[in-house]
Amino acid sequence: MSVSSSKQPGNDANDANSSVKGVSHLIIVQIIAKLLTFVLNQLIIRYLSPSIIGVTTYLEFICSTILFFSRESIRLSVQRVRNNSDNKDYVAQKVVNFGILAIAFAFPIFMVIGYWQLNYSSVMDKLFVSPFYKPVIVLFVASVILELLVEPIYCLYQFQLDFGKRSKFEGSAIFVKCIVSVLSILLARQYFVDQKFEGVAICAFALAQFSYSLTLFACYLMSFRFEFQNNKINYNLVKLKDENAREFYFEQDTLTIVKGFFVQMIFKQFLTEGDKLLISHLCTIEEQGMYAVMANYGSIIARLLFQPLEESTRLMFTKLLNENTRSQGDEKPQKSESHKCMQTFNYLKLISIFYFNLSLIILFAGVTSGPYLLKLLMGGRASNWESTDIFKLFPQYVVYLPFLAFNGILEALFSSMATNSDLKNFSKFMTLITILVLIFSYLLIDVLNLRISGLILANVFNMSSRIGYCYFKISKFYSKENVKVSFVDIVRYSCPSILITSIIWIIQLFIIGKNTTNFVQLILNACFSFVLVIILMVMERKNSKKPFEKVTNKFMKPKLD
């Protein structure tokens, strides 16, 4: 009996093709949903103060931290579950068991983070003196519980590379969240003012988050019951037997990987989200709100494009590179492994070219027009933020975005090819970097009083260190297959594009100046950016043609057959 007639794990071509088709749906839905979020948020930002945004952003960060620690190591590991049985229900149940493990992880994590927040968080002190703080806490806790309850189903769909369902479910949930937040804020504005409005506004965001989680829960649960009602897959922890009749709940090899990833995720969370922890202790509520708005507007491309690409790349590479562990009886393992290695390397070249050129365009357009665009988007509402340095700091955040992008894709590749030994070594490296980043951040933010500028510099150091480590490990991985990844070649390859970008920027500097200050200059910057895009496309046409053809031919082959 099969879990799903359309899913046949074990065929790397089908896996890759499924991943490519699925991620296209995921990217499209996420772009539409997040653009909708962006547009609807424009309707309410005029009513919100930096302190409201600071508190709500921090509460969302706490919820995401609990969810991250509870489930991320499992999400990274379930693709490694061995598909070593003809009974697809048996394999699916192994995956579901790991999803249940995420719920068990959550209880101690809830206790630790809850105690820490109640005793050491200045943001929570601010929340407790505001009206309606009790419903806020209840709604956020309930939303975390609901999202954890769907984790077994999420893991099953992820194992099957079924991005279609995820894109539909998340798109629906984001839409509901947007509508609830906008309507709640607009309604609260009619009946409350001053401090009471701030309390109700925070409660409105909590209600929106709860509606998001409830929608996800309903969609995943109904889908699971409809699709698997005739299969022998249980939504609970089931004791299984291996080929030697030994009973187990969790596949031992995969459980070892979960442990390795869990330790790694602790440090990754501190490094990735440590800026929010630092500013909660070193910055005022208003500064936190300013940084949240800047990050929200500045990273919209990262959230729309980079994040889906990173996740799909990690999943696809993991399935391809670990398929040999499920087919040890094949007569041509060496040929298959070498072929998979070259397939992933071609994809790596293609996506690196894309990321590099997109980063140049982001820097060229964002540094020049970013502050003006931010003012334009906020319109007459900008007066609420005049006392902050958000418009001066925004170009600095734009410079940070390429580091964020390359770190994300390289870590996705590294996690897909890492062994248990690699994960242990990476955990040690992350320990060292965590300590260095915390010290560096404290010195820049507090001692040198650079505030958010210091925070951005610390984040650049953080991402640069991780990029360097992942580059070294990825190069070492491919060198075993006699594929050379040379840093000198990368620099030589990058120089012409950087030179062209610099020349166009200098020309623009004489015509527009360092930053745009009016709509005419914004249009001129857009024209210069368009010219840069055309030139870069012409320059990269030959470089990207060969790897692009290899990747597309491989992925489209099942369709042609």
UniProtKB/Swiss-Prot annotation:
Q: Would the keyword Transport turn up in this protein's UniProt record?
A: yes
Offer one Pfam family short name for this entry. Answer: Rft-1
Per the record, the pathway is: Protein modification; protein glycosylation
One GO biological process this protein is involved in is:
protein N-linked glycosylation
One annotated GO molecular function: flippase activity
The subcellular localization recorded is: Endoplasmic reticulum membrane
Q: How does it sit in the membrane?
A: Multi-pass membrane protein
Asked whether the keyword Transmembrane is assigned, the reply is: yes
Q: So what does this one do?
A: Intramembrane glycolipid transporter that operates in the biosynthetic pathway of dolichol-linked oligosaccharides, the glycan precursors employed in protein asparagine (N)-glycosylation. The sequential addition of sugars to dolichol pyrophosphate produces dolichol-linked oligosaccharides containing fourteen sugars, including two GlcNAcs, nine mannoses and three glucoses. Once assembled, the oligosaccharide is transferred from the lipid to nascent proteins by oligosaccharyltransferases.
- What is the protein name given in its UniProt record? Man(5)GlcNAc(2)-PP-dolichol translocation protein RFT1
Q: What gene does this protein come from?
A: RFT1
